[in-house]
Amino acid sequence: MIGVAATRVENRVFAALGLQKSDISFDSCESVEYGGVLFLLPFLLANGLLSYKKYYSQRHSGYYDFDSVILTLAFMYLCRIKSVEQLKHYSPGEMGKLLGLDRIPEARCLRGIIKELSIQERACEWNAYLSEDWIDHEDTSIYYIDGHVQVYHGHLANLGKKHVSRQKLCLPGMIEFWVNNADGLPYFYVTGQVNEKLQEMITTQLAPRLLELTNGKVSQQELDTDELLPRFTLVFDREAYSPSFFRHLWESFRIAVITYRKNVKDKWDEKDFSAYDVDTEVETTMYLCEKDVELNGVKMREVRRLTETGHQTSVITTNYKLSTILIALYMFSRWTQENFFRYMRQEYDIDRIIQYGVDEIDKTTMVVNQEYSNLTQRLKKLREKKARHQAKLYALVTENIKGEMEQTGKNIEKQLCFRQEIELFEAEEQEILAQRKQQPYRISIDKMPEHSRYNKLKTESKHLQNIIKIICYRAETAIANLLTAHYRKGSNEIRALVKSIIFTKADIYPDYKSNILTLRLNSLATPRDNMAINEICQTLNDYEAVFPGTKLKLVLKTATVTPARDQEV
């Protein structure tokens, strides 16, 4: 048994003998499931999907080469098939038609080929290459940084607990620190080892990597000429707030920051705020005010936004080149990165554990001592008990002063009981403090008890597949941006329309004489959608994308051509 839809028997026999790989050959087909996914192929290739070849060695034998597997994974994720296991429930022959094959790899075969890629351990290098290419083409100097926790519910790994804001709980997991642009498009991410804080990761990994990727975008001569010019600007939330940290970034790297200010006590006069018209998805008005401020000896700019309720949201920055309105816009655009995390969780299942197994952590890594933390927790609970007893004692003393003489005896007895318990609490408190004093606050991993010693999940395969998911997201965004131009208002429905295109059947017609692969998309749900997709076909065809492994140029068409109307879609 070769398998369902395995029609190219001779090729498979030759591949099994190591004589040849699969040939990419398209047949004329009508109404192919998920045919619309090929509309995203030009953007997948433009975003570097096949640039993996610069870092990964190709397979020497086997029916499927790495190109077919990478394309299979990309199409799989775009079709919202979130794991290799789920492929078992989809027609392998229909998916194979999209790749010019008889069928896609069986789940076990696909896992094996992914493992062949993963053991080469080149995901970080590939991601670095892609990041540099994207940054060069997008020409941005604003980078958004935030952590995303991948919650772990298993028992194999001992992971430190992280605060998961979306669940408002501290749970075991691994934290990924992502770098995105102002539109939410991701560049790269770094996985923390244990419980690293955002400040630490920016200093040790994210800032050095961004400096390397942006090397030369701002020359040293420009920096020397203009003392206020930053290399680039980082935008993050209050987690990394620290004026001394901001000074370190500026003095050591010439990196500016934009973030929310913590512990704002005062209010500015509302008469100082001016109205600014802001054009986002809809035109809105912001009431802003800017003043210079000095915090812990660090001079910064503070911009506040006045809301309708009278609340003043404070934003601070060390960037003196941006206008007031841009500072506010960049800070309040952080929601694009949050939306990216939510979309990737829901649509691409980015938190899924892909590779089982654990790796050891560098034994010299310093972590918070669990014994110290346990004693601190005991001390906190004990002090809470003592505070409650002191409050009750105070109430009894007050009652005794104001009460009647007949109740004084009973009242004093109760007071005595509370005083005795408080004394016991104080004695226990001193004992815990003495025990905690003997424990160091931080210890190295190798000094942790073996049964609770931290380790980490294997990440190479997940990193590889996350890169493909990032490219898929960027391809989706690119076609969504094209569609937005043909609508009166940009809306969240654009993403739904892109999904609708992907899920729509299409006809495939190869012409090997002219080296053209024509894809004709079936009708979408509404004339408005048909008109929009028909309008962007020429733009997509201008990319002149050639299907990988062939000389066939992709030509995209729609089956329904809606006549132009006066009204705007």
Map each language-model feature to its residues.
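Short, solvent-exposed helix-loop connector elements
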Residues: 54-60, 162, 317, 325-331, ...
